[in-house]
Swiss-Prot record:
Family, per entry: Belongs to the calycin superfamily. Lipocalin family.
Cited InterPro entries: A1A_glycop, Calycin, Lipocln_cytosolic_FA-bd_dom
Induction description: Alpha-1-AGP is synthesized in the liver, the synthesis being controlled by glucocorticoids, interleukin-1 and interleukin-6, it increases 5- to 50-fold upon inflammation.
UniProt domain comment: Contains a beta-barrel that binds various ligands in its interior.
MF-aspect GO terms: small molecule binding
UniProt KW keywords: Acute phase, Disulfide bond, Glycoprotein, Secreted, Signal, Transport
UniProt xrefs under CDD domains: lipocalin_AGP-like
Organism: Rattus norvegicus
GO CC list: extracellular space
Glycosylation, residue list: N25, N34, N76, N94, N104, N134
The keyword Disulfide bond is annotated on this UniProt entry: yes
Protein name: Alpha-1-acid glycoprotein
Amino acid sequence: MALHMVLVVLSLLPLLEAQNPEPANITLGIPITNETLKWLSDKWFYMGAAFRDPVFKQAVQTIQTEYFYLTPNLINDTIELREFQTTDDQCVYNFTHLGVQRENGTLSKCAGAVKIFAHLIVLKKHGTFMLAFNLTDENRGLSFYAKKPDLSPELRKIFQQAVKDVGMDESEIVFVDWTKDKCSEQQKQQLELEKETKKETKKDP
């Protein structure tokens, strides 16, 4: 699910601490290091997600595409999130900050008086990461992000296997369709406009 939206929607449910054995091949609680944060500092593409809760499913289905930029602050343990999401054939921009809980291996976001957590699962070899939600609860969920919008058969298989490992079915996965992206061209035009504006400003005496 989209990074910003999933953390907002999850304010409806508390994150349950892992009291049961973790699902096979999914390791939670790996500490987040400076190296991890530097690796996360990049442009990311939301590829898809699987959620059991009906509210989450509905939210996932509204997202046509999404990409975002993560800019970590190693001193304050926060991450700046700039998100470009295509919904209803319209580009929507979101900006927020995420908290980093290094020892627990989680990211968090404040939604009012509630702090929502998600376990970070990094797959550096494949240039991807996942966010795990409520894996010990019936309303569990898993979302998938990559550095490129092209979902190769290998990456698709990796996420499908991860979904099965957490006790869900492949049929519950909703992948995005990047042919419906409305933000990339809009952002490109905006950047070109900003460059032209800067040039004109420099010309002025």
